């Protein structure tokens, strides 16, 4: 008789575990994969904007005295000479010279001709090119013009930072030192890439060289903020591990002098049911600003709420490495290429029913991302990536309890895209619109699924409300910027989000009563009060416009506060 209550408890737990394992989609039970995806949302970095025009070297016409009756003469030939008085082939100037040769010209006309030649070369990448009318005697209508394209003279470095002189030299050797002339695109690329190095501020200064037609380059580098840290709190956590999350982190730049960066982030939920630690170290490895990095991530969780009786918990270890290369750097266009490898060990268990599942995932991702100042006062952002993955799946569940589509080994491919545009409007207004999505070739493990909810998705739903194999998200936002105090900005916004997708790529094993598709949409408003580099307070409220998620909240209130040091 004493054994019956014990048997009843175990039988109930096993029955509950079986029902829950078959109803993950409906109840949305978090696991290591989905929780890692939720944490990835908070690590999304602001997209880098192109800097805009760096050098504006329009040639100015020299002052020429104007007379009522200027002396004119027939121009029969124009000889273009370099700084060594050697004649230069002028085929590329034919469209300019035809407007003067064979006509009567004055000194003012010749001055305009020299200025047009200067403009032509400056518009064709010769940053400091200049055409000059030297003193001369004009014979038989032949005029000589001295063309100085701007040879590279002395390159000097004033380095008052922790950045290595050798690295700066290697970077200059792949840009400004690749030509005998000061080329605008190479100088711009050098300026942009060296200012991309974390922890330094760099400036360039051109001056006249010792020889005729030469320009000296002075590179000034100073330390920016080498050490920084932050603390933050938000309510973006999962209701089963704790809604409120406390995070802290630190970043150190230029530890070795090669533009390296060390980042450490720690996070815990208010109930300590979710703990996460992440470290990321990267360094520049060549004169082309290619960056190599390694990452490590640890997560541990314990579920409460409806899953507390199952004693559900789990942990994951992630190790990764990546290569990031600035493929194109111009003032109005940025393109980066990234190749990354990631190894994941994921473990989930329900101790009450002694069920444990382990997954090992190896993945290789190849992608590009960039931004483009295509429209005046507007920036377009884009990214494309393809992930090739291999999954090794282990479970101690009995065969009749396991999912019908369970496979111990599988390969999968995931395609992601993102396209958005930010447009500045008059009166301190702005409008943002964006679309992003994911395609897959087969049903995915939870760590590879796309989250339709959360702050990076449909903001009227929690992040774990819907995770899909294939999905698409459209977001629009109307903003207003109001300067407050000396350096703070108050941003108010109205937004609309719409997302849709399929829970499973392959739905053959699903019961006919199970709905495989989902659509979410919401509207909301937000306020952000911030001082760049000091603090930020973000508040938003969003209301769902659908009833496609069972037991969904009537609205979502999002709050985050961060203080940087």
Curated annotation (Swiss-Prot):
Segment forming the signal sequence: 1-26
The POTRA domain, residue ranges: 73-150
Main localisation: membrane
GO CC annotation terms, alphabetical: cell outer membrane; pore complex; type V protein secretion system complex
Pfam families: POTRA_2, ShlB
Location in or out of the cell: Cell outer membrane
Any one Gene Ontology molecular-function term assigned to this protein's record: protein transmembrane transporter activity
Keywords: Cell outer membrane, Ion transport, Membrane, Porin, Protein transport, Signal, Transmembrane, Transmembrane beta strand, Transport
One Gene Ontology term from the biological process aspect of the record: protein secretion by the type V secretion system
Domain notes: Probably a beta-barrel protein.
Family (UniProt): Belongs to the TPS (TC 1.B.20) family.
Biological role stated in the UniProt entry: Likely functions in the release of soluble HxuA from the cell. Probable member of a two partner secretion pathway (TPS) in which it mediates the secretion of HuxA.
Protein name from the UniProt record: Heme/hemopexin transporter protein HuxB
């Amino acid at each position: 008789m004493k054994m019956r209550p014990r048997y009843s408890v175990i039988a109930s737990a096993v029955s509950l575990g079986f029902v829950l394992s078959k109803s993950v989609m409906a109840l949305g039970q978090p696991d290591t994969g989905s929780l890692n995806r939720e944490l990835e949302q908070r690590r999304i970095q602001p997209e880098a904007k192109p800097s805009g025009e760096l050098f504006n070297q329009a040639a100015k016409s020299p002052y020429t005295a104007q007379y009522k009756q200027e002396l004119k003469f027939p121009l029969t030939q124009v000889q273009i000479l370099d700084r060594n008085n050697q004649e230069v082939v002028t085929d590329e100037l034919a469209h300019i010279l035809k407007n003067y040769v064979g006509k009567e010209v004055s000194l003012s006309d010749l001055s305009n001709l020299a200025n047009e030649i200067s403009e032509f070369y400056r518009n064709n990448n010769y940053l400091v090119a200049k055409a000059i009318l030297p003193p001369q005697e004009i014979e038989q209508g032949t005029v000589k013009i001295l063309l100085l394209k701007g040879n590279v003279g002395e390159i000097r470095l004033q380095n008052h930072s922790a950045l290595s002189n050798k690295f700066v030299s290697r970077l200059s050797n792949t840009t400004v030192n690749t030509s005998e002339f000061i080329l605008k695109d190479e100088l711009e690329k050098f300026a942009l890439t060296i200012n991309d190095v974390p922890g330094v501020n760099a400036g360039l200064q051109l001056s006249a060289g010792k020889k005729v037609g030469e320009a000296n380059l002075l590179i000034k580098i100073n330390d920016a903020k080498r050490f920084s840290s932050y603390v933050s709190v938000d309510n973006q956590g999962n209701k089963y591990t704790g809604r409120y999350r406390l995070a802290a982190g630190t970043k150190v730049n230029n530890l070795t002098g090669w533009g390296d960066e060390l980042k450490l982030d720690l996070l815990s939920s208010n109930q300590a049911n979710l703990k996460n630690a992440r470290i990321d170290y990267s360094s520049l490895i060549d004169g082309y600003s290619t960056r190599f990095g390694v990452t490590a991530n640890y997560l541990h969780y314990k579920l409460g709420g409806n899953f507390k009786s199952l004693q559900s918990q789990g942990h994951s270890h992630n190790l990764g490495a990546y290569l990031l290369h600035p493929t194109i750097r111009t003032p109005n266009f940025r393109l980066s290429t990234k190749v990354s490898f990631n190894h994941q060990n994921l473990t989930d268990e329900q101790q009450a029913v002694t069920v444990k599942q382990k997954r090992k995932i190896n993945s290789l991702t190849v992608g590009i991302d960039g931004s483009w100042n295509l429209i005046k006062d507007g920036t377009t952002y884009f990214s494309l990536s393809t992930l090739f993955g291999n999954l090794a799946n282990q479970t101690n569940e009995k065969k009749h309890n396991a999912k019908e589509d369970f496979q111990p080994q599988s390969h999968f491919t995931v395609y992601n895209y993102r396209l958005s545009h930010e447009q500045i409007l008059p009166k301190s207004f702005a409008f943002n619109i964006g679309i992003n999505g994911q395609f897959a070739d087969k049903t995915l493990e939870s760590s590879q699924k796309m989250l339709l909810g959360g702050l990076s998705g449909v903001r009227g739903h929690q992040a774990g409300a819907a995770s899909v194999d294939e999905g698409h998200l459209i977001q629009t936002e109307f903003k207003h910027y109001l300067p407050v105090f000396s350096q703070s900005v108050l941003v108010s916004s109205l937004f609309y989000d719409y997302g849709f997708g399929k829970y499973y790529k392959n739905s053959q094993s699903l019961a006919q009563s199970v709905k495989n598709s989902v659509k979410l949409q919401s509207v909301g408003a937000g306020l952000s009060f911030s001082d760049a580099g000091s603090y930020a307070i973000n508040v938003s409220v969003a209301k769902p416009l659908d009833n496609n998620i069972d037991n969904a909240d009537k609205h979502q209130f999002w709050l985050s506060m961060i203080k940087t040091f």
